[in-house]
Regions:
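C-terminal nucleotide
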Residues: 1-119, 130-175
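Glycine-rich active-site/cofactor-binding loop and its immediate structural neighborhood
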Residues: 126
Length: 175
C-alpha cells in the first residue's frame, strides 16, 4: 500500500506538514483515467540515477531546489510565483520522461484556461495532474469537457496516525 507513508521513515526524505500554516489550498487534482504502473516510470529513472546519469542527477537537484522555493511561495501565499515553480518542475519531469500524453493534454488545457501552474502528480505517464487555480469551478468545467475523468479538491487532513492503547481497555486473556 501507499509509498507516501514510507517517506516519513526514509532517511533521505524531508517531509513537513504545512497545513497549519496555509489558510487555503487553491489546487485541484484532475485524473486522466489512464491506469499505469508507477514502476514503469520510476525504475528507468532509478537505474539512470544509479548509473550516474548527469541529466537525471541535475534534474533531481533542480526539482529539489524548486520544491524549497515552492515551499516559501506556498507559505507566503505567492500563488503566481508558486505557479511558475510548478511549471518549471513539470518541465524537468517531462524532460526526464515522466509525463505522458494524457498528462500533457490536461496540463495544456489548465494553463490555457487560467491555471497559474500545473504539473503531473504522482509517478506520471498518465494518472493525475495538480493545477493551481484561483477559479477552480471554471477550470473543473473545462477539464471535464476536455476528457478529464474526475476532479478532486485537496484539503488538509490529519491522515493516518498511531495512538496509544487505552490502558483501561486491556486485552482479554485466553481462558
Amino acid at each position: 500500500a501507499g509509498g507516501k507513508g514510507w517517506l516519513f521513515e526514509d532517511a533521505f526524505a524531508t517531509v513537513e506538514q504545512l497545513d497549519g500554516y496555509v489558510p487555503r489550498l487553491p489546487f485541484l487534482l484532475a485524473h486522466t483515467g489512464v491506469e499505469h504502473s508507477s514502476d514503469a516510470v520510476h525504475r528507468p529513472l532509478r537505474e539512470r540515477w544509479l548509473e550516474g546519469d548527469r541529466e537525471v542527477r541535475r534534474g533531481y537537484e533542480e526539482i529539489s531546489r524548486l520544491a524549497r522555493e515552492g515551499k516559501r511561495a506556498l507559505l507566503g501565499g505567492d500563488w503566481e510565483r508558486l505557479g511558475r515553480l510548478m511549471n518549471a518542475n513539470h518541465a524537468v519531469q517531462r524532460d526526464l520522461g515522466g509525463s505522458g500524453e494524457a498528462n500533457e493534454h490536461l496540463i495544456r488545457l489548465a494553463l490555457e484556461n487560467g491555471a497559474l501552474g500545473a504539473k503531473l502528480a504522482g509517478a506520471g505517464d498518465g494518472g493525475t495532474i495538480i493545477a493551481l487555480t484561483l477559479e477552480p469551478e471554471a477550470l473543473e468545467e473545462v477539464l471535464m469537457a476536455g476528457g478529464c475523468e474526475r476532479v478532486l479538491y485537496p484539503s488538509p487532513v490529519e491522515g493516518v496516525c498511531l495512538e496509544d492503547e487505552d490502558p483501561e481497555a486491556a486485552p482479554s486473556s485466553p481462558a
